[in-house]
Structures are given as C-alpha cells and as structure tokens.
C-alpha cells in the first residue's frame, strides 16, 4: 500500500513532464530560426505536440484507472500501460534531443563561419542551453530506478542518483522519493556547474548522461562567450 501511495504522490510529475515538452515546443516556435531546424518553424513544434497529445491522453487514462484500482490485477494493467507510455515518452525525448543537437551544430557552424547577427546567435544559444536542461531533466526522470513506470509499483533497490534526502544520519530514508522537480534541479546544476553538485550519479548510465549534458552546456556557453568577446573587440 505504501508503494501505491507513492504513485499517487507523484502523479503531478507526469503532467510536469508533459508540460516540459509543451514548453520546449513553445520555445522552438518563439525563438528558433528556420535555418536551425529543417522545414518551416511550425513543423517541428507541431510534430512534438502531435506526439504529446496521445501521450497526455494515455497518462490521464492511467491515472484515472489508478484512482479506482482495487486489486493486483488492476495494478498489473496499470503497470503495463505505464511501460508503454514510458517507451513512447523516451521516443519523444530522443526526438527533441536530436533536434536540439542539430540546432547546436548549426549555431556552432555559423559562429565559426563568422556569421553576422550576434544578438540572434546569442538568443539561439541561450534557447538551446535552456532546452538542454529540460531535455536532460526528462532523461533523468525517465531513467532513475527504471523510470516512472515502476514508481509506486516496485521496490526501489538500485537508484541511479543519490539525493541528499535519501541520506539521514548515515541511513537511507525510505519515506522520500525524487520527483520531476528534483531531476530538473539536478539537470540545472549540472548545466551550470558542468559537474554534479549535491546529487551524485551512481550508475554508469547516469554518469554518461551527466557527462553528455555538461559537454553540451560547456559548448553552448562557449558559443555565448565567444560571441560576447567578438562583440567587445
């Protein structure tokens, strides 16, 4: 029963994750130039939102089923549904990650090619940097302890991240579990410090993801610094 109450406690995290994708689509629509992503500036955000709609509907259906679940059979159906939702969510996150990487490569090429329009390049780079934070928050949330599909339905035995709240007087605190906001904070601090801060990666995959995020962030900040120096000189 304690595990299933954890599912209810973190129900809002699924909607925060869906909202994060919608925010990325909005940022792309408002700030990305058509030269950075293929096709019309409406194409990519539209694809993302079209993929987001069935994902949101499935999330709402699953949470509705969880509120009325009465036996293990119901929870088994919910678990299977959440696994399918997680796979589709990972696909959408990978798609957004690829597009952000393409945009970063395009901005880097323009900077190295001496492109004009310093203000535009700065806005593009900052947008890529912030989008990267959201993307990796989604990756961390989807990866830790087998992802949200297992949350509240299976015992968490091998976490991928060690949060400060998990340690109390040297002992693991089982009453606390991380939510999407916690993973967003981890992503933000990793992108600004270029290394872990108060939350440590434990698994190889978490270390690899944090390394990739820090590298992308370092390159993006380098673009901003290079453009600033160019403007000043």
Where are these predicted regions, by residue range?
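N-terminal membrane topogenic signal
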Residues: 5-19
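Hydrophobic alpha-helical transmembrane segments of multi-pass integral membrane proteins
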Residues: 18-28, 48-55, 89-106, 127, ...
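Alpha-helical transmembrane segments and their membrane-interface junctions
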Residues: 28-29, 96-115, 180-198
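Short, hydrophobic transmembrane alpha-helix segments
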Residues: 29-41
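Membrane-helix interface/capping segments
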Residues: 58-85, 101-115, 145
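Pore-domain transmembrane helices of cation channels
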Residues: 109-149
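Membrane-proximal soluble regions of multi-pass membrane proteins
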Residues: 142-199
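Pore domain of cation channels
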Residues: 177-233
């Amino acid at each position: 029963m304690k595990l299933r109450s954890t599912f209810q406690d973190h129900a809002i995290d699924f909607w925060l994750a869906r909202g994060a994708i919608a925010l990325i689509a909005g940022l792309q629509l408002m700030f990305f130039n058509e030269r950075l992503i293929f096709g019309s500036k409406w194409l990519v955000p539209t694809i993302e939102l079209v993929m987001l709609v069935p994902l949101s509907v499935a999330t709402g259906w699953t949470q509705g089923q969880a509120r009325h679940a009465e036996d293990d059979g119901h929870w088994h159906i919910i678990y299977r549904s959440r696994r399918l939702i997680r796979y589709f969510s990972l696909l959408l996150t990978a798609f957004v990650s690829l597009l952000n990487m393409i945009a970063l490569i395009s901005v880097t090429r323009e900077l190295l090619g001496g492109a004009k329009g310093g203000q535009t390049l700065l806005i593009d780079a900052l947008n890529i940097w912030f989008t990267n934070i959201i993307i990796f928050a989604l990756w961390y949330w989807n990866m830790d302890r087998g992802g949200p599909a297992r949350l509240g339905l299976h015992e968490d035995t091998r976490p991928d991240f060690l949060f400060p709240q998990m340690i109390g007087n040297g002992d693991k605190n089982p009453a606390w579990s991380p939510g999407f906001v916690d993973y967003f904070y981890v992503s933000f601090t990793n992108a600004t410090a270029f290394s872990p801060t108060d939350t440590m990666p434990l698994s190889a995959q978490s270390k690899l993801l944090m390394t990739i995020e820090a590298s992308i962030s370092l390159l993006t900040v380098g673009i901003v610094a290079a453009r600033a120096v160019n403007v000043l000189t």
